[in-house]
Design a protein with these regions (language model features):
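N-terminal mitochondrial targeting presequence
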Residues: 1-47
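Fe-S-dependent hydro-lyases/dehydratases of central metabolism
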Residues: 41-809
Length: 809
């Protein structure tokens, strides 16, 4: 093991990072005898979910023998459709599974938020099934604009989005899906409170779905086509992730919070450092964290590209299950572990933690006792600065020193613990006669959280401080924010948020708004100062009577003293059996919803005559490819939302934003040129740099280019979810074999594929090259790499995954 002290700006107060690279957690391939199978009828009964889990786990153990498994592997492999097929194929007889094997998984449930659920439901409808094969839920949280306060905003949102909400509720009734109405809460918080359980595997149509890892649940963010695969009962495919271990030692103190763990880690790993990996946390430091604190950390694993994140089951997990009226779950877990402990083979025993001796592909150690608060940004979640150095960096970078707004809550940081820690600061400030100097917004994560905070007096404390309590929805975090402070587009300003993502222009549509990510406590304290250079640990604020006031370190409660309050019954879940008589109607003149037309299948030859629509430079996120905010209203209407495609991308050759040039030299916006070429029948490709598609699980970032005529995307590297989404929609993602070849291709170049059709016919086996013809007539050959699997090759040949699924294949 190599020890590395990181003393860079993101290093903070010498938080120690230990990194180790090594082989997979594999020691033997000894096959266990069949006596590891359990006879459940003659033993202590287990609930069906855990009986199924443990039965499959014993199958996994027979295949892998005495290999030591991490918790993530235990849960993931125990959801394989056929463990022997997945774990032995493409591996060395069960060795070197990570990063090589293609896992065909059967998730336990699917959760969908309203923006992505529209397209997922439209695709599911094409499959002509009476009900989903597994439980599913729809959560109305993305379409409510935050502005004046919860009551006004929710009322306006319901009226504005009535057509979409009615569509989703009708679909839920018809197919027997749970429906969480607008105002019920943000999907990730609602899932944590109601559906997440240790050992489950879920898919969520949102990149921050791994939030549920705080309760030892494997939850993976996916696009709508992936969700439909699971809903129709087909195995869902995933390249076996590597396992990145994060050992937590020590205990948080003073101003440090769980949020700072992931802010610090993001600074170390960068936005690409977790790609292809599950982040698994372990160590004695884990025992000091609350379940919701662990969820916060897992939530932001998406910002480093991780497939998902997970924590072991702890006493805090049990307390959270108790407080959310799920005490039976703790009894079920005890029953499972007790049942498994009776196995004559120690390798077949089950605990909700990694096996002793399990190894990680990389190991990072964070000492919580020396961790200090961090602030990340602007414009990227991995630009990490310790609080002690932030004032200096603000001045060096000439960032705005006036804080225009502080926003806390969201799916990442709206727990009872978060809010009561903030409450302690507000009470401190109230005694000193202080009010926030910047606009201060609070977003409760769910009606359960809001109602409990109201019952316990915390909400009143927020309101007395002048805070604006927004509705239980995503709001400003997803770009649904109608600012009331007069800050106009083009005005440089700074906001501080406890959110999870801070891409340029994301929150308010203003590319000059700098969003800095921090814990709710740091956001709150700095909002009182109204300054980005204020350090609440060392600095003071002048009170109205001229005295110096310093905040005491925040403190709060892990959870309420009594169980959570349910809140407004009208905001509760609508849960029902499928009703085949429910009609789902879409007006042919609707601007919000439109039935899908199937994409054409792949031709029976290589692609030729493609043109490069635009060559993109710099960060190209899913926000860049398919913006959220005001565009969310078109999520169910592919032609309409396609008019925003790549509309904030930077043209490499001109430096312009949202500019592309036709073959005759005429200038257009990128989506305008895409539409023109679609009308001409001119198919095209995009060329881009690293981590293309970083950010959300937004499948529209794949659907829109496909709709406009994209057949290939050529980059230096892809974000995991987006690469999968492209293949599901019939677009071929290719990466440069030699990154320097990025400089050899230009907008307008003619491109033909070489070997692509043969590779697809061979189930993903084979190399692909691109023959590029320049305007001068010069031809060059660019070698590429791909990660197309056998199943994905079938999707591309069919034109899309939906084309296959709708035929029952």
């Amino acid at each position: 093991m190599v020890s590395m002290e990181v003393a860079s700006r993101s290093g903070g107060a010498m938080t120690q990072l230990l990194r180790r690279s090594g082989p997979n957690a594999i020691r033997s391939t000894t096959v266990l005898s069949n006596n590891t199978r359990r006879n459940f009828s003659s033993a202590r009964p287990l609930p069906p979910t855990y009986e199924k889990l443990y039965t499959k786990y014993t199958d996994v153990r027979r295949v892998l023998g005495k290999q030591r498994l991490t918790l993530a592997e235990k849960i993931l492999y125990s959801h394989l459709d056929n463990p022997e097929d997945s774990l032995l194929n493409n591996t060395d007889n069960g060795r070197n599974i990570r990063g090589k094997a293609n896992l065909r998984l059967k998730p336990d449930r699917v959760n969908m938020q309203d923006a992505s659920a529209q397209m997922a439901i439209l695709q599911f409808m094409s499959c002509n099934l009476a009900k989903p094969a597994i439980p599913a839920s729809i959560h109305c949280d993305h379409l409510i604009v935050g502005s004046k306060g919860a009551e006004d905003d929710l009322s306006a949102g319901i009226q504005t989005n009535k057509e979409v909400f009615d569509f989703l509720e009708s679909a839920a009734r018809k197919y027997g899906m749970d429906f969480w109405p607008p105002g019920a809460g943000i999907i990730h918080q609602t899932v944590l409170e109601n559906y997440a359980l240790p050992g489950l595997m879920m898919l969520g149509t949102d990149s921050h779905s791994p939030n549920a890892g705080g309760l030892s649940t494997i939850t993976i963010g996916v696009g709508g086509a992936d969700a439909v695969e699971a809903l129709v009962g087909a195995p869902w495919e995933l390249k076996a992730p590597k396992i990145l271990g994060v050992q937590l030692v020590g205990k948080l103190s003073n101003w440090a919070s769980p949020k700072d763990v992931i802010l610090r880690l993001a600074g170390h790993l960068t936005v690409r450092g977790g790609t292809g990996s599950i982040i698994e946390y372990f160590g004695e430091g884990v025992e000091s964290l609350s379940a919701t604190g662990m969820a916060t950390i897992c939530n932001m694993g998406a910002e480093v590209g991780a497939t998902t994140s997970i924590f072991p089951y702890t006493k805090a997990s049990a307390r959270y299950l108790d407080s959310t009226r799920r005490s039976q779950a703790n009894k079920n877990i005890e029953a499972l572990e007790a049942f498994a402990s009776n196995s004559s083979d120690p390798d077949a025993r089950w605990q909700f933690k990694a096996d002793e001796g399990a190894e990680y592909d990389e190991l990072i150690t964070i000492d919580l006792s020396t961790l200090e608060p961090h602030i990340n940004g602007p414009f990227t979640p991995d630009l990490a600065t310790p609080l002690s150095k932030f004032k200096e960096v603000v001045k060096e970078q000439d960032w705005p020193q006036v804080l225009s707004a502080g926003l806390i809550g969201s799916c990442t940081n709206s727990s009872y613990e978060d809010m009561t820690r903030v409450e302690s600061l507000l009470k401190d400030a109230k005694k000193a006669g202080l009010k926030p100097a910047a606009d201060f917004y609070i977003t409760p994560g769910s009606e359960q959280i809001r109602a409990t905070l109201e019952r316990d007096g915390t909400l009143q404390t927020f309101q007395e401080a002048g805070g604006i309590v927004l509705s239980n929805a995503c709001g400003p975090c997803i770009g649904q924010w109608k600012r009331q402070d007069g800050v106009e587009k083009g005005t440089s300003n700074a906001i501080l948020t406890s959110y999870n993502r801070n891409f340029r222009g994301r929150n308010d549509g203003n590319p000059d708004t700098m969003n800095f990510l921090a814990s709710p406590e740091i956001v709150t304290a700095m909002a009182f100062a109204g300054s980005t250079t204020f350090n609440p640990v060392t600095d003071s604020i002048k009170t109205p009577d001229g005295k110096d006031f310093m905040f005491s370190p925040p403190h709060g409660l892990e959870g309420p003293q009594t169980p959570f309050e349910s809140g407004n019954a009208e905001l509760g879940v609508l849960s029902q059996a499928p009703d085949p008589n429910t009609k789902i109607a879409i007006s042919p003149t609707s601007e919000r919803l439109a039935f899908l037309e199937p994409f054409a299948p792949f031709p029976s030859s290589d692609l030729s005559g493609l043109r490069v629509l635009v060559k993109v430079t710099g960060k190209c996120t899913t926000d860049t490819i398919s913006a959220a905010g005001p565009w969310l209203k078109y999520k169910g209407h592919l032609p309409n939302i396609s008019t925003n495609t790549l509309n904030t991308a930077i043209n490499k050759e001109t430096g312009e934003v949202n500019a592309a040039y036709d073959l005759d030299g005429s200038k257009h916006t990128i989506p305008e040129l895409g539409q023109l070429w679609k009308e001409r029948g001119q198919e095209w490709l995009v060329v881009a740099e690293h981590n293309y598609g970083e950010g959300s699980a937004r499948e529209h970032a794949a659907l829109q280019p496909r709709y406009l005529g994209a057949r290939v995307v050529l980059t230096k590297s892809f974000a995991r979810i987006h690469e999968t989404n492209l293949k599901k929609q019939g677009v071929v993602p290719l990466t440069f074999e030699n990154e320097a070849d990025y400089d050899k291709i230009a907008a307008g170049d003619e491109v033909a594929t070489v070997g692509l059709y043969e590779m697809l016919q061979n189930g993903g086996k084979g190399d692909v090259q691109l023959r590029v013809t320049k305007a001068s007539g010069e031809e060059i050959l660019i070698p590429t790499k791909h990660a197309v699997t056998k199943d994905q090759a079938g999707f591309i040949l069919a034109g899309s995954a939906l084309n296959l699924l709708s035929k029952g294949i």
